[in-house]
């Protein structure tokens, strides 16, 4: 099936297998490997992207369902190789260890901050509740998102 999708401001037209998941289309067909595949079942959130402005788990959507959509992946955050404020806050607050969950956490946090520039700690925790981190215990992640909101 032929689809046209805009990812990180660039429009792609591709023929895709109707059974192909969006995450595999993004990573394997377009070579945008910043989003991670953790579970392929929608549980971990490592594959979170912004889909028409909403945070979604890209392992839960078929690529053909993205026809006509606008998608932002973690690659959209940095410009000219420089970290954006959210990425810098994650670095400054040691909000990552292994880094596997980080792309999904960043995109969930971006979605929150796009909707609410000054979220409470409770709102931050709710926004990232679909993202699993087995390393940090979430404290530094929450602190990083708070710092990025200032």
What spans do the regions from the language model cover?
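Signature of N-terminal electron-transfer/Fe-S-associated modules in redox systems
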Residues: 1-150
